[in-house]
Structures are given as C-alpha cells and as structure tokens.
Amino acid sequence: MKNKLIYILFISFLFTQDEIGVGLNTQDLINYLKSNYTTSSTLSYNSARDVMYGEIYNVNGQVSCFYTNFTVQNVPTSNPRPVVHAGGLNCEHLWPQSLGASSGNPKSDMHHLKPCKENVNSYRSNNPYGEIVDSQTDNWLWLNYNLSNIPNNNIEEFSESTNYLFEPREDVKGDVARSIFYFYTIYSNVADDIFFHQQKDILYQWHLNDPVTTSEINKTWLIAEYQNNIPNPFIVDTSLIYRLSLIHI
C-alpha cells in the first residue's frame, strides 16, 4: 500500500509541471516531439567532441569520465581533444554507434555523448544497460580502479560490467535513461528496436529513482545552444516517458 501511495504521489508531481505538448499522449505526443525537438543539424563529430570536452563537461579545466569520475586535468577550452585523449578519455555514445548512431546527426548529437575512460568505453561496448547481480559482475569500475571482486567501500560509486550488460553508477542512472528515451524517440528511423525494448522498463525505474538535477538541466541547455536551441525534452518535462506509454505501467 505504501509503495502504491508513493507511486500515485510521484505521478501527481509529474503532472504539476509545465508540460510539453499539453494534452497529447502516445503517438500524437511522439509526432509532436519529432516535429519540435528534432535538431536540423548538429556540429561535426570533431567539433561536437571539442565542445563537449572544452565547455559542456569542462569544470575549471577538469573533464571526468561519466561512468567512473576518472579525471583529466588541465584541459583547455580550445582544441581540448588532444589533451583529453592523451589523458585516457574518449567519447562514449550512450546509444551505441553500431545500433543506430554511426553517422550524421545521430552520431554527433551531444544529448547522448559523454566523456568516458577508454577501457570503460570498451567494457560498455554496445551492451544494453541494466541491473547486474553483484556476484555476477566481472568488472567494478571507479576512478582508476578496475576490480574483479565486490568492493568493500564506496560501492555506489562504481559502474559494473559483464560481457552482456552494463550498469552505470547510481548518480547517473537517470541521466542515462533520459538520453536513451530521447534517442529512441527522435531517431526511431535508425534506432535498434530490440536494443531499446530489452532495457526500457529498468530505464524507466532509473528515471524515477534518479530525478533530473540542476546540472543536467544546465547541460542540456548548453548543448541546445549548438543544436538549434533544442534541449532534451525528457529533461525539461519528466512526465514525457509516462505519457508516451513507452514503458509498461
């Protein structure tokens, strides 16, 4: 009964916000989002990475791995790629390149690009996201740590991987979910359906459990400045996933 009450209160909270596409649901809302939140152009892939490393994720010259918080220091705002790459970071596509983000706008859309430690990017590969049973985790990844056994401390700071699944650290699970729902909605013509549907339910739970932060809002609007002033609508209006019926309620 308590869980049901919490769920009802959460849904009530969603609908007290300013809504995108007021009164629209399911396919009508999908069509509205495609018409109003699809960027007509993105930066080139090189330029997008420069903006990502030099501005969006650059905090006083520090750029950190999205999944592990491993940090490269002294990153310039101009031409940052050489420093970032030499420090061991590259660009992670939350929606994998091999499953729909291999070229054009889907590849360069910064709403699903993140700085990532090279080996962690490889561990993630093109695997779906999900919850991994701790005893089945192959790699525990945090900062520069790569452990094969369950950590004794700071366990929620670690991302986890197996050869078929990837679980990001707790603090970014909602960010991941909102990026994946964005990509699948906006780029449905190229997005792999199986990849999305096998993880959509857990992603919705992550969306609920890890709400939008001020930092996430600020970043999506910074990105929008380079992409036709279009933010990720799933960050702006957190009721969208529910209203789109993209998950099983």
Task: Give residue ranges: language-model regions.
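Sec-dependent N-terminal signal peptides
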Residues: 4-13
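Short, flexible beta-strand-to-coil junctions
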Residues: 14, 68-73, 184-187
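Hydrophobic alpha-helical membrane context
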Residues: 14-15, 105
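N-terminal module-boundary/linker segments of secreted carbohydrate-active enzymes
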Residues: 17-71
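Long, well-ordered hydrophobic secondary-structure segments characteristic of membrane-embedded
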Residues: 53-91, 98
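Domain-level detector of nuclease and nuclease-like folds
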Residues: 81-90, 94-246
